[in-house]
Amino acid sequence: MSSTYKDLDKIFLIGAGGFLGAICRFSLCELMESYYGTLSVNVLGSFMLGLIMYDTEYIGFIGPKGKLAFGTGFMGAFTTFSTFAVQSFTMPFFPALENISVNLFLALVGVFMGRSTIKALSGREV
């Protein structure tokens, strides 16, 4: 198979994952107010990306194609740094500071929890 076809395969996987991730983000944000919807997708996305990245490194259940589809495609479209930035920019100073602090802290906690889950499942030091 030529490299062009391999690249098309990767592009399709990322695009399909992105399509589903965008739909899921839209659906979840429609259920909540904008601030809470954005916070929810970013924290959930950080947890899920933590699972995906550490799984591909230590367990291998997802595999390279799954990492492209779910890690790059789905999570790239599901999470939304730009919406978080615009929402923070348009808020008064102290609510914006709270929004920034809560988003960053909980996103890092999400990655930590994803990593901890993989560590527990693999039985290895991660």
UniProtKB/Swiss-Prot annotation:
InterPro entries: FluC. Na(+) binds at residues 76, 79. One of its GO terms (molecular function) is metal ion binding. The chain crosses the membrane at residues 11-31, 43-63, 69-89, 93-113. Pfam families: CRCB. GO terms for biological process: cellular detoxification of fluoride. It is found in: Cell membrane. One of its GO terms (cellular component) is plasma membrane. It catalyses: fluoride(in) = fluoride(out). It is a multi-pass membrane protein. Its main location: membrane. Na(+) is not transported, but it plays an essential structural role and its presence is essential for fluoride channel function. HAMAP family: FluC. Belongs to the fluoride channel Fluc/FEX (TC 1.A.43) family. This is Fluoride-specific ion channel FluC 2. It comes from Methanosarcina barkeri (strain Fusaro / DSM 804).
